[in-house]
Design a protein with these regions (language model features):
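Bacterial N-terminal signal peptides
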Residues: 7-19
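C-terminal substrate/ligand-recognition segments
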Residues: 377-387, 392, 417-450, 465-481, ...
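C-terminal structured "cap/appendage" subdomains that terminate the fold
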Residues: 468-521
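Short coil/linker segments at helix-helix boundaries
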Residues: 26-168, 173-245, 249-258, 271, ...
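Boundary at the C-terminal end of the N-terminal hydrophobic targeting segment
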Residues: 20-25
């Protein structure tokens, strides 16, 4: 399978990167501003006149770049002009189903369900249009007694059927690939599902090299250790295909981060940040785009890996200054918590981490227990490592409560497992503070093994501190340098370029000549 994926990645290089080679030759200028809107080449034919068709194609292009709000506005304008256009309401329904981005808010779901029901009532004017309308209906209907995973799978099956009925429909193939990614298991390290989606997308590539969905979803398909390098052509092309979409400028940094290409990640996210602000100036003056916070988290991560602490500090200050969002999205919740926590933990400023608070106070944290857990984890680790065990236990108790609130929640990513990792990390450092060293090792080994079995959520560039990196730190602290070498090397296999693991590995190697060996890290 890997050979097939490699071959398909080579096809991307031939058909897409070759077309953008002149721009790619000047990396310092890859995100130049464009005077006209550029969202990629999309044509999704429906039964409307020429002007409405152009507007529909634009809205679908925005949808493929996850610019959901602007896409929804476009579909709504079509519906206002032609209230009997069922496909306009299909588009609105699609804008409120986010198969990769995480839990769907109740407001989004209700809005999408109403649009889906309207589309079903109006119907499509062709069998193909009707198939699209029927497919999205499988996600929204029966929500009172069918859980979200089952409805997402029903949508995937419906898109598979559509793809089989209309094999020459490029949009059907692309949306089918996205539906597959929405159901990819987080614990299958063969990535068979993701490779299936990548194969579908690469089959479309020769016919649609400038399609935003092909590049975008290929990045998501290959955003995993061992596969990320195959997505470099797509990453470096996507920002050329749709530079008017902030998410298209940010998305390449997922791959740059996976590969430790920090300078490219910074350039990508600075460009995305500028684009996000331009969008807000036009659509929500005075508000911050939640997508910008997502970009700021990736920027912080990259700055910290390069030791650019002053630049990272400026991001922290900017996060603290946010007073209004265009949407209370999961990306915003994660960034609000992660950015200050990263800044303290990556610098090993344990006292600073212990003093973190859940902020901003105006944000509805009760809707995002998994995000608050980031702050509590940083507090727990920081307090334990600075000698304040009582404070660490308080943070752990809050983590336990948050973990219980997520038990049985099945809507996309399993955050309960991630909280389990975080609880074990805090327990490990509490044990170390109490000189219960074997217990500390057991907890951190357990945390590292569990974290290694999971895939990170796309909302994050990476763990605040990888559990196995923390295990390496503990092993060094206990004088077990040889075991620490193994731990750090394992981290760098999946997260190349991590500053603390590189530094820890260098120190462990210096000490390992005389250090005792042990069982396993």
């Amino acid at each position: 399978m890997k050979r097939i994926v490699c071959t398909l990645a080579a096809l991307w290089a031939v058909f897409l990167v070759g077309r953008t080679a002149p721009a790619l030759a000047h990396e310092d200028h890859v995100h130049e501003a464009v005077p006209v809107e550029k969202l990629g080449s999309v044509h999704f034919p429906i039964s409307v006149g020429p002007e409405a068709q152009r507007n529909f194609d634009r809205a679908v292009a925005l949808l493929h770049s996850f610019e959901y709000e602007e896409a929804q506005r476009g579909f709504r304008e079509i519906a206002d002009q032609d209230p009997k256009c069922g496909m306009a309401f299909w588009g609105i329904a699609m804008c409120n189903y986010h198969p990769i981005w995480g839990p769907t808010t109740q407001a989004d779901f209700d809005r999408g369900r109403l649009a889906s029901e309207t589309a079903a009532r109006l119907g499509g004017k062709t069998d193909r249009e009707q198939s699209y309308i029927a497919a999205i209906a499988t996600y929204y209907k029966d929500a009172d007694h069918v859980d979200a995973p089952a409805r997402r799978m029903a949508y995937e099956k419906a898109m598979e059927s559509l793809h089989q009925r209309f094999p020459d429909d490029l949009e059907g193939t692309i949306f089918y690939a996205l539906s597959i990614l929405g159901n990819a298991p987080t614990t299958d390290k063969t990535y068979a599902v993701q490779k299936k989606a990548a194969a579908l997308l690469n089959s479309v590539l020769p016919k649609a090299p400038d399609h935003p969905g092909v590049a975008h979803y290929l990045i998501h398909s290959l955003d995993y250790p061992g596969l990320a390098e195959l997505a470099l052509p797509a990453a470096r092309a996507y920002s050329k295909i749709a530079p008017s979409a902030p998410h298209a400028l940010h998305m390449p940094s997922h791959i740059f981060t996976r590969l430790g290409l920090w300078d490219e990640s910074i350039r990508s996210n600075l460009a995305a940040q500028r684009a996000a602000r331009a969008v807000m100036t036009k659509t929500h003056p005075g508000s911050t785009y939640f997508e910008e916070l997502h970009e700021m988290d990736y920027l912080t991560y990259a700055y910290l890996q390069l030791g650019r602490y002053g630049d990272a500090r400026r991001i922290v200050d900017a996060i603290h200054a946010v007073s209004q969002l265009n949407q209370e999205a999961p990306q915003a919740a994660f960034a609000f918590a992660a950015v200050p926590a990263r800044y303290a933990l990556e610098r090993h400023q344990w006292g600073e981490a212990a003093r973190l608070t859940v902020a901003p106070a105006w944000f509805p944290w009760d809707k995002f227990a998994w995000a608050e857990a980031l702050t509590q984890t940083a507090r727990g680790i920081g307090a334990a490592r600075s000698g304040n065990v009582a404070e660490s236990r308080m943070a752990l108790a809050r983590l336990d409560t948050l973990h219980q609130s997520l038990a049985g929640v099945k809507d996309g990513y399993d955050w309960a497992d991630q909280l389990d990792v975080q609880r074990r990390e805090v327990k490990g450092w509490i044990a170390r503070a109490g000189r219960r060293d074997e217990e500390a090792l057991t907890e951190l080994r357990s945390a590292a093994d569990l974290e290694d079995s999971l895939d990170k959520n796309p909302v994050t560039p990476g763990a605040m501190l990888p559990a196995r990196e923390q295990l390496g730190d503990l092993l060094l602290d206990l004088g077990r340098a040889r075991d620490a070498v193994t731990a750090y090397e394992e981290v760098l296999k999946s997260s190349p370029g991590r500053r603390n693991s590189i530094r820890g590995l260098a120190k462990a190697k210096r000490l390992s000549a005389t250090g005792p060996s042990s069982s396993r890290p």
